[in-house]
């Protein structure tokens, strides 16, 4: 009888404990999923915040790395998880996400400044652990495409073949209604794809900015060839449409019109393809290429960007460094001097690169930035000025006269493809091609 009573007491106590635990669990409410406008305020420093469409940019000056780290802990305690961390020289970058929101933080110790970018979660860039593929040991190459458009002698289109035979495309060029340039791009992809490939695979299409001479080819390519290629993801970060209306209402055959066509193509032809908004500090892994984003337009705030100041699309260009096949390529788009000076100011030895793209077809430049990059090879996108730009401006003259620059390659007269890594013999190249023979329309 005593044993039976003991068993009953144990069962009653067990049920009570289980019930208490259940009640405790049921009473524990899940944390609220914080949206873009619900984030806790950064706890220190002098704060300045700007709303850009669906994105909030907060710049906190007079802060320390401990403040940056403490805010990360605050976000983690509020239901965020760390998506990625990156370190470039002494600068720290962290991306955190929840189901609704992405937060991108940076800390630049030279200015004791923390920047917080909050936006809807959207599609995310590929990290190292996401970059799963099988290399085919195919020679990586870099191709600069000559544009054929008669609208304007401007444009930029680069094609990088990766070691599995897929591609990264950067911009594309002006394009034209006759689809000459988009057909040229498609033919390059077909010719450089592995034998037997039914559809060329574009692992990433990156747009430096939204001017028509950079996105125009994409628009016509999408109409003619969207179902003849496979595209895995798009990467870009354009300024607001309001800025475009203020600064770029007419530029090289109406960039606003071309941007509207760009949006239409994205919606109509690629509704399910990820569209990643990339930011300063993102490290993107695409096959055997690793890309560090060094500058995106949010960092124009507050000096060149606020409720009254609107940057041009050139000023909003991305700057990023591609590491591939043991070499590095610095891409600048049409960036203006402010952006070049920004990366020169905040980055140190990491700017050194083997290949440099001259900014804005050679029309924007910075001696400090170019000398920090200190390239061995220089690429000049399609330019109405041709090689004349090498005689204009201290930055371009520095590149022209630098003893470390072995070759300047331009794409105004022809498409050019080089292997990566690129290490030609001196006998195979000339630093500046002989204008009187190779470029008869140009007198150097």
Region spans (language model):
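Positively charged n-region of N-terminal signal peptides that target proteins for export
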Residues: 1-4
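C-terminal motif of bacterial Sec signal peptides marking the signal peptidase cleavage site
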Residues: 18-20
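Compositionally biased P/S/T/G-rich terminal and signal peptide-adjacent segments
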Residues: 25-61, 119-126
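Amphipathic N-proximal alpha-helical interface segments
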Residues: 45-51, 97-128, 225
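Amphipathic alpha-helical segments
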Residues: 62-84
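Core dinuclear metal-dependent hydrolase active-site scaffold
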Residues: 122-200, 275-352, 418-444
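Binuclear metal-ion centers of metallo-dependent hydrolases, dominated by the metallo-beta-lactamase
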Residues: 133, 233, 239-292, 298-300, ...
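Active-site metal-binding motif and surrounding structural segment of the metallo-beta-lactamase
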Residues: 165, 178-236, 241, 346-363, ...
